[in-house]
Amino acid sequence: MVIPWCSSMMRLLWFLFALLLARSVADAATANYTFTVESMRVSRLCNSTDIIAVNGLLPGPMIEVNEGDAVAVEVINGSPYNLTIHWHGILQLLTPWADGPSMVTQCPIQPNSSYTYRFNVTGQEGTLWWHAHSSFLRATVYGALIIRPRNGSAYPFPAPDQEVPIVLGEWWSRNVVDIESDAVSSGQLPRESDAFTVNGVTGELYQCANDTFTVDVQPNTTVLLRVINAGLNTHLFFKVAGHAFTVVAVDACYTANYTTDTLVLAPGHTVDALMVTNASAGSYYMAVQAYDSLSPTTMAVTDDTTATAIVHYNTTSTKKNATPVMPTMPQSSDSATANAFYFGLRGPPSPSAPAVPTKVDVNMTIELGLGQLPCDSTQSSCSGKSVAAAMNGVSFRLPSQMSLLEAQFNRTPGVYTADFPDAPQPSGTPMVEGTKVRRLKYNSTVEIVLQNPTAFPSENHPIHLHGFNFFVLAQGLGNFTPGNVSGYNLVDPVSRNTLAVPTGGWAVIRFVANNPGMWFFHCHLDAHVPMGLGMVFAVDNGTTPDSFLPPPPADLPKC
């Protein structure tokens, strides 16, 4: 049962808790940032393109904090577009108003307006990132968010000699908002990107390339690469010629050491990997190519180019202009390499591993579906049918007049319905549109089987959960069956906030709903979000002030 905000006792308890929380925040260090979002002209691929960027930077400014810090980011929207910012992977405990997905937790920041996001970084360490969460703006509005151990603490691995953020992106030579608008209007998929980028630049294999990101390293040192896939729609293979990696964290969750020469990142993923500079002195390409989980079907529309950066050994014997060594990349359709990476990750060994909850309160199976719906009146260039996507047959639609979180807090009827189905619909059931959420009792344990279709071509969907990390208990190919339960890893499963559900396969996740609010659960291929591949969990309040949805901040944007 949701405890109404109008309860005078709960208001008093919340007031007392807020005073304690304010004192706690005051005692913590506060990292203050100002993001000015404006148009800027950038030259790439022999063209000049106007993009939306933060503080004139691509990637945008890096946020660096220690675990336990408070963060305040004033976002000034000087762009012509509505805008929100999402702090991807931040748990937002009791700060759901700062999560950022447009029309889920807030109305957008309108042009010539501002909003200050305030949240704490508690119980998290590693590499996360921030990005726009409205339209395709996140193609250029993104940046790294680094959380280091609090003072006096250390990494659970040998301290690196050097840390290097590597933010991977996709580049279009057209206005990305127009690209999305054209796709939605026509009911078709958006065109593929024109290039990939490493820290905002393409590298020297593209036409008119005049800038390449270079990492200068010393021999026989350990470099911590903080790799982020900020791309919109493409899974990526990542390699450095002549070097191997030891993965130590994903999605700001520590892992058991995992050695590989190929990192695989779905959109939204982060990987912390140690690289030892034990190769011969020289220069080596860092290469990025697409993993196209649809290949070789004719549905594939993936950028087939290669972005590069350079790892340069800074010695007297190394020539700066020497041609770097190129790594041998996997084939774009190499699902075996992708699955080996995703399936091979484990959580840290005991006793460091967090305990997996064993009593499950809510069991769900969510089928990820692609299909078609009739064109609607807003799709001016659509003919007959429009591409669509759904979870359990429901193609998700955002509200237009009020955010879901405001509707939950104010108990406003008519904004959403709490009838999202717990299981796939019978075969042949038509896809429907709706703003359906799944209510969860506070502190309930939820297990979800995510199933990709196996009867026709599908693709690897990176599914992102806001507000929580989850345990990945099992993954496999084909259809999930009850017999797969015996294979659950309840000892050292990896924790993530974004999971790549394999093509023609399944994955099982489990989490505890201990964070009241409205939490988006959606595909992180941005092309699939307006198509409807998402839903929302509405987590009820608990019974104590530290489990109760706080009121909205005074400067929360209005619709």
UniProtKB/Swiss-Prot annotation:
MF annotations from Gene Ontology: copper ion binding; hydroquinone:oxygen oxidoreductase activity; oxidoreductase activity
Record GO biological process: lignin catabolic process
Ligand binding (Cu cation 4): H461, C523, H528
Protein name per the record: Laccase-7
Biological role stated in the UniProt entry: Lignin degradation and detoxification of lignin-derived products.
Annotated compartments: Secreted, Extracellular space, Apoplast
InterPro entries: Cu-oxidase-like_N, Cu-oxidase_2nd, Cu-oxidase_C, Cu-oxidase_fam, Cu_oxidase_CS, Cu_oxidase_Cu_BS, Cupredoxin, CuRO_1_LCC
Pfam family, one: Cu-oxidase
Residues where Cu cation 1 binds: H86, H464
Organism: Oryza sativa subsp. japonica
EC identifiers of the protein: 1.10.3.2
Enzyme class: oxidoreductase
Cofactor note: Binds 4 Cu cations per monomer.
Cellular component GO terms, alphabetical: apoplast
Keyword annotations from UniProtKB, A to Z: Apoplast, Copper, Glycoprotein, Lignin degradation, Metal-binding, Oxidoreductase, Repeat, Secreted, Signal
Cofactor(s) needed: Cu cation
Residues at which Cu cation 3 binds: H133, H466, H522
Gene name tied to this protein: LAC7
UniProt cross-references to NCBIfam families, sorted A to Z: laccase
Positions annotated to bind Cu cation 2: H88, H131, H524
Family, as annotated: Belongs to the multicopper oxidase family.
Residue ranges of every copy of the Plastocyanin-like domain listed in the record: 36-152, 163-316, 396-543
Catalysis: reaction(s): 4 hydroquinone + O2 = 4 benzosemiquinone + 2 H2O
Residues with attached carbohydrate: 32, 47, 82, 112, 120, 151, 210, 220, 257, 278, 314, 363, 443, 484, 541
